[in-house]
A protein has these predicted regions:
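Short amphipathic, positively biased membrane-proximal segments
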Residues: 1-138
Length: 138
């Protein structure tokens, strides 16, 4: 449940930052775009994939939590989520080169500073929510 709630918070933050900044970096299209070129289906499948990945990441947080610095829950979640984002970001240029929606122009090029900063903010929301909710389990 924790991963689902944190993933939902991430998606809500994404929708808000897209509206406020006008950027087109949509994680639903990012994940769903690998499977279909139908925009509605991309968003549906992308939401399911994104939520599933958030649940898996929450499980990884649960395994890593005893080894993380002894900080308040929200800060530990933030540290974990930003660590994951930073460690995996070097793979993003490969994703960008291979992604059908980037090639079609449906998504902007990934791997840019703008994309990293947006992902950092979105992951911060995910991590803060994850750490806040997980705190009761420690």
């Amino acid at each position: 449940m924790t991963g689902t709630v944190a993933s939902t918070a991430y998606l809500l933050a994404m929708l808000l930052d897209m509206r406020l900044t006008g950027n087109r970096y949509d994680d639903r299209i990012l994940w769903g775009g690998y499977l279909t070129d139908d925009r509605t289906l991309q968003k549906t499948l992308g939401t399911a994939i994104h939520t599933s990945l958030g649940i898996v990441l929450a499980g990884a947080y649960g395994m890593a939590a005893p080894f993380l610095p002894k900080l308040p829950g929200p800060w530990r979640g933030l540290l974990f989520a930003e660590g994951e984002n930073t460690l995996l970001f070097p793979l993003v240029p490969l994703m960008s080169a291979l992604h059908p929606e980037v090639r079609r122009g449906g998504l902007p090029r990934l791997g840019t500073v703008e994309f990293f900063l947006l992902e950092a903010v979105r992951h911060a929301i995910y991590g803060l929510v994850l750490g806040t909710l997980w705190r009761d389990r420690e």
